[in-house]
């Protein structure tokens, strides 16, 4: 796994959920550019924030790293 995988996975799961980066950022309690900063490589979430992101995206941390979770997108 690498940072690009994490960034792409957040994007793929967010799209699957049908929410914008802006909406996801605000619903997680951050500035409107929070998710955009993560997926563009300007920042990474802390472990605690990663767990919140997984919860928001309705996936377990294990499923987050499982390629079959978003198969068919």
Identify the role of each PLM range.
Residues 29-45:
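Recognition helix of helix-turn-helix/homeodomain-like DNA-binding domains
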Residues 24-25, 53:
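Short alpha-helical "recognition helix" segments of helix-turn-helix
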């Amino acid at each position: 796994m690498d940072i690009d995988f994490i960034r792409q996975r957040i994007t793929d799961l967010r799209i699957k959920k049908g929410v914008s980066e802006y909406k996801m950022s605000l619903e997680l309690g951050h500035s409107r550019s929070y998710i955009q900063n993560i997926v563009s490589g300007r920042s990474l979430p802390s472990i605690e924030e990663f767990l919140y992101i997984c919860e928001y995206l309705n996936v377990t941390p294990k499923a987050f790293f499982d390629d079959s979770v978003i198969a068919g997108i």
